Amino acid sequence: GSSVVGAYQINSGLDVFVDGTGWGTGSWGSGTWGSTTSLTDSNQLRLWSMDNFGEDLISNPRGGSIYYWDNSDGLTTRSVALTALSGANLAPTKGLQVIVSDVDRHVLILGADPINAAGSARTGSIDPLLIAFSDQENAAEWEPRSTNTAGSLRCSAGSEIIGGIRARQETLIWTDTALYS
């Protein structure tokens, strides 16, 4: 016989949201045994966002790395980190959601990690209100220059971006307190 060994590249994460305030909370336990604690712990389920960039695919697990799959490499080739693309320049390393604008084909990363003060690298820490966008028609170029359309915007209201969606000739992005178009 033969054997097969499988190994995942990215943990699939939880399939449910888990929120708790201690072991044995609820009706289980008596007295202080099984009572709740003032400390809470939450484990977010794994939410993926994916969008087409032409015939290619850009994907992002919420709060994780951004990946790019090139259709011309074939179905047996896996996605690579956006930062590993040929010619990648200051591409975000993390984000909350990815969207491709349908009108002008910018890749948008909602909740991206910002470029550092020196302008030489990404910080690696998510700014929950930052929207970073690539150069038009170029998913690898993220450095804002006078010769391209890459850049970023920070939402002025709210504490985090909740989500975004393409609508008719616009992209809607909402935070916990505002809606942007």
Spans of features found by a protein language model:
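Leucine-centric amphipathic alpha-helical interface motifs
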Residues: 5-42
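Beta-hairpin (beta-strand-turn-beta-strand) motif
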Residues: 14, 62-63, 112
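Beta-propeller and closely related beta-pinwheel folds
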Residues: 29-43, 75-181
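Hydrophobic or amphipathic alpha-helical targeting/insertion segments
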Residues: 55-80
